[in-house]
């Protein structure tokens, strides 16, 4: 261990904690890798969420390693000695090694980062562990454990992450952190929710004080990066609280130009209840933000990356237009207007509605789900009708009559079809 970094190492040794929280396979692997790195005159460290969770008493998960040296060369050396497969990610100086029984670890060269402009992806250069930890989002994620045989188990904690863990604080590492990478705000709120922590006061103040710059920085972040963070946020146990916290920090205004109001919170709560313990779909979750405000659809379009999400937005717009122009809401009339709209956007819309409209749409969806059409196109051809656009009208209208209760059996349905084609009634 070089003298220039000794001041960063916590006096506590975490060997006992490692033995308690890591599997035997992981422990043996880490010791072996530390020895291999030492023989190559390199320092190897366990970093990130595994260290954080160990200190919280939570069993370790994935192994993320940082080496003061060439991660690509070291990972290849690991594969040569221990077997397994290695995949290099050369632009980022990272590698993934998979060994026997699916033992997996990610190895990264220690590096420093600089940002050409707020929100942009960073430029990296090789460096030491302290610089590598300094590029991370929060102090609780900026700790490492030394794996060198002479220092094995020593905690590297230059930003006092262990203190913040003990006190339940989420703290950024420098004043430009949120501007350099605005997605850190989303991650911070996720950790606040997951661990029941709070933002350290200066961190909270900086989040609020940097709003104009934050809006500009977010414009440089790709929708895919933001979507990734939103998906993770929606897998937490209390997304409503997280979305409300993002509103308090003005993130929704900066990101979408929309407001997560009390009605948005009610809408999201109803959506979550409908999931029966399953994670929320991230796109439906953010669609509750400023739902049906004037610029709602335009604000969400950049994040509607898949065809399914694009159709969802279009379906909601169609529902809104049709319901706005309707003067009666009987089930059969609703069916004429909404029969082509899938159940999911209808449920979403219903959950945003007032009590009366929600009851109307719930009843329609229930009856539509129970509907078993008594007529088919084959039936119409057997009646001597030639296929035409009127087939679709006839089949739809007979479903409406079924919902109304005027068609109760097959004979009623066939009689309806005969009369329809005799009169060629349009919709």
Swiss-Prot record:
SUPFAM superfamilies: Nucleotidyltransferase, Poly A polymerase C-terminal region-like. Keywords: ATP-binding, Magnesium, Metal-binding, Nucleotide-binding, Nucleotidyltransferase, RNA-binding, Transferase, tRNA processing, tRNA-binding. One of its GO terms (biological process) is tRNA processing. Mg(2+) binds at residues 62, 64. It catalyses: a tRNA with a 3' CC end + ATP = a tRNA with a 3' CCA end + diphosphate. Its EC number is 2.7.7.-. ATP binds at residues 49-52, 136-137, 141, 181-190, 194, 225. It comes from the Bacteria. Its cofactor is Mg(2+). Optimum pH is 8. One of its GO terms (molecular function) is ATP binding. InterPro entries: NT_sf (IPR043519), PolA_pol_head_dom (IPR002646), tRNA_nt/polyA_polymerase (IPR052390). tRNA nucleotidyltransferase involved in the synthesis of the tRNA CCA terminus. Adds the terminal adenosine residue to tRNA. Belongs to the tRNA nucleotidyltransferase/poly(A) polymerase family. This is A-adding tRNA nucleotidyltransferase.
């Amino acid at each position: 261990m070089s003298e220039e970094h000794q001041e960063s190492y916590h006096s506590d040794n975490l060997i006992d904690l490692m033995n308690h929280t890591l599997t035997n396979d992981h422990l043996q692997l880490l010791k072996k890798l530390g020895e291999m790195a030492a023989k190559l005159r390199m320092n190897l460290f366990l970093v990130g969420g595994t260290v954080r969770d160990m200190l919280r008493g939570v069993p370790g998960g994935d192994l993320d390693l940082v080496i003061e040296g060439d991660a690509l060369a070291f990972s290849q050396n690991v594969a040569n000695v221990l077997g397994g497969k290695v995949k290099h990610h050369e632009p980022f100086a990272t590698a993934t090694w998979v060994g026997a029984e699916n033992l997996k670890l990610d190895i990264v060269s220690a590096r420093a980062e600089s940002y050409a402009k707020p929100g942009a992806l960073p430029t990296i250069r090789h460096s030491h562990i302290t610089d590598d930890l300094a590029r991370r989002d929060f102090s609780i994620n900026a700790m490492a454990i030394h794996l060198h045989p002479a220092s094995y188990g020593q905690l590297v904690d230059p930003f006092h992450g262990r203190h913040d863990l003990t006190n339940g604080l989420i703290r950024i590492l420098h004043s430009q952190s949120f501007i350099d990478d605005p997605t850190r705000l989303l991650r911070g709120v996720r950790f606040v929710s997951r661990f029941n922590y709070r933002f350290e006061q200066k961190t909270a103040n900086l989040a609020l004080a940097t709003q104009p710059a934050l809006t500009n920085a977010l414009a440089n972040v790709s929708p895919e990066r933001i979507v990734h963070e939103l998906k993770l946020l929606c897998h937490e146990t209390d997304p409503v609280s997280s979305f409300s916290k993002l509103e308090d920090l003005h993130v929704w205004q900066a990101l979408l130009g929309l407001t997560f109001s009390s009605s948005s919170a009610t809408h999201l709560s109803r959506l979550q209840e409908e999931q029966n313990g399953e994670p929320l779909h991230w796109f439906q979750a953010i669609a509750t933000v400023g739902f049906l405000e004037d610029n709602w659809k335009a604000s969400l379009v950049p994040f509607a990356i898949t065809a399914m999400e694009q159709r969802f937005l279009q379906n909601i717009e169609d529902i809104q237009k049709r319901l706005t122009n309707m003067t009666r809401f009987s089930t059969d009339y609703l069916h004429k207007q909404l029969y082509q709209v899938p159940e999911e956007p209808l449920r979403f819309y219903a959950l945003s509605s007032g009590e009366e409209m929600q009851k109307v749409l719930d009843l329609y969806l229930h009856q539509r789900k129970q509907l078993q059409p008594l007529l088919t196109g084959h039936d119409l051809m057997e009646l001597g009708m030639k296929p035409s656009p009127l087939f679709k009208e006839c089949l739809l209208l007979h479903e409406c009559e079924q919902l109304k209760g005027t068609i109760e059996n097959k004979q009623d349905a066939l009689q309806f079809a005969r009369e329809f084609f005799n009169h060629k009634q349009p919709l």
